[in-house]
From Swiss-Prot:
One of its GO terms (cellular component) is cytosolic small ribosomal subunit. One of its GO terms (biological process) is translation. It comes from the Bacteria. One of the primary rRNA binding proteins, it binds directly to 16S rRNA where it helps nucleate assembly of the platform of the 30S subunit by binding and bridging several RNA helices of the 16S rRNA. Forms an intersubunit bridge (bridge B4) with the 23S rRNA of the 50S subunit in the ribosome. Keywords: Ribonucleoprotein, Ribosomal protein, RNA-binding, rRNA-binding. Part of the 30S ribosomal subunit. Forms a bridge to the 50S subunit in the 70S ribosome, contacting the 23S rRNA. This is Small ribosomal subunit protein uS15. InterPro entries: Ribosomal_uS15 (IPR000589), Ribosomal_uS15_bac-type (IPR005290), uS15_NS1_RNA-bd_sf (IPR009068). The gene is rpsO.
């Protein structure tokens, strides 16, 4: 369920500001989105896994806060990120 190093490098290469960027909000949101989608698939199979469901809700909340920050700082970056990730907002 955890992201492998190769998966992280691939995601950071696409969404980070540079190759080793791990701190920018775009990179963090992209990593959280991948983890959220993986957990969502897990919960489709294991409906009664309430510990993982709580973890999913925490990740969604963290992503929401980061997206709110990006929207406040730069709306163009926010819209670009939402479009590239395929989020509904």
């Amino acid at each position: 369920m955890a992201l492998t190093t190769e998966q992280k490098k691939e995601i950071l290469g696409q969404y980070g500001l540079h190759d080793t960027d791990t701190g920018s909000p775009e990179a963090q949101v992209a990593l959280l989105t991948k983890r959220i989608s993986d957990l969502t698939e897990h919960l489709k199979q294991h409906k009664h896994d309430h510990h993982s469901r709580r973890g999913l809700l925490l990740l969604v909340g963290r992503r929401r806060r980061l997206l709110k920050y990006v929207a406040q700082v730069d709306v163009a970056r926010y819209r670009s990120l939402i479009e590239r990730l395929g989020l509904r907002r």
